[in-house]
Amino acid sequence: MTSNAPITPPIFDGHNDILSLLYDAGLSMAAPVDIDRFVTGMAGHLDAEKMRKGGFAGGFFAIWVPSPIDMDIKTTQMNLPVYDLPLPPEIALDKAVPVALAQAAILHRMEQAGYLKICTSTAMLQSCLDNGEIAAIMHIEGAEPIDRDFYNLDMFRRAGLRSIGPVWSRPNNFGHGVPFRYPSSGDIGPGLTDDGKRLVTYCDENGILIDLSHLNEAGFWDVAKLSQKPLVATHSNAYEISPHSRNLTDR
C-alpha cells in the first residue's frame, strides 16, 4: 500500500549553538563536557533525537565566545515590543582563544563518537547527505579568537573551519557588530576595519565562507565590494517582514 504521507526533505540549517550550549553546561556543573547529552537529550531546539524527527541533515555548528553579561536579562528585554540594547564590550584575544579551542574540540569529540561528520568540502557534504550522516560545517561566530596575523585562523582551518562571521553583536578588531535594537535600521555605525577587510580577502583565498549575519549595513557592503565569493547570511531575516537592526533590506 502506497503512503500518502508527505516526505520531509532533508534540512540543512544555517546556524545552531550546540557547541556553546555543551561548553556552558560543563562550566555550570564544574565538570568535563558531556557530549553524550547530545544523544540523551538537551534543552533547546536541537539534539540527536530532535534532528532525527525533524529531518535535520546538517548545518553550521557555531563556535561562539559569550559576553560576560546576564543573558537572561537580555532575553527578557528582547521580548518587549521596543528595545535597544547597548553593544557588549570587546573580548580580548587571550580570553577568546581558549573558549573557541574548547568548542572546536567538542565538535571533534562528537565526530569521534560517531554523532556527526565535520565536512571540509562539497564532496564530503554530499556524501553525508547521500548516506544519512549529520553533516557539520565548523563556523566561528565573531572573530575574537583570530589574531591580526591570522596564525590562529590557519590552525582553525586545519581543524576544519570553513565559515566565519567577522563579528557577533559587539565590536572587535575586524568590525562593528549591529546592536540588538527593534525597530531599527541596520545602517548603524562604521563597517569593517582595515584588518576586517584583510580578513575577507584572506578567507576568500583560503576557502572560508564569510557570514554576513550580525554585520551592520556598512559592513555588509564592505564584504560585497571585497569578496569574490557568493554572499551568505546564515541567520538573518527580511527587514520588510521584521524591521530589526540585524535583518536585511531588499536593497
Please provide the spans of the model-predicted regions.
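N-terminal hydrophobic targeting/anchoring segments and the immediately downstream early-domain regions
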Residues: 1-186, 243-251
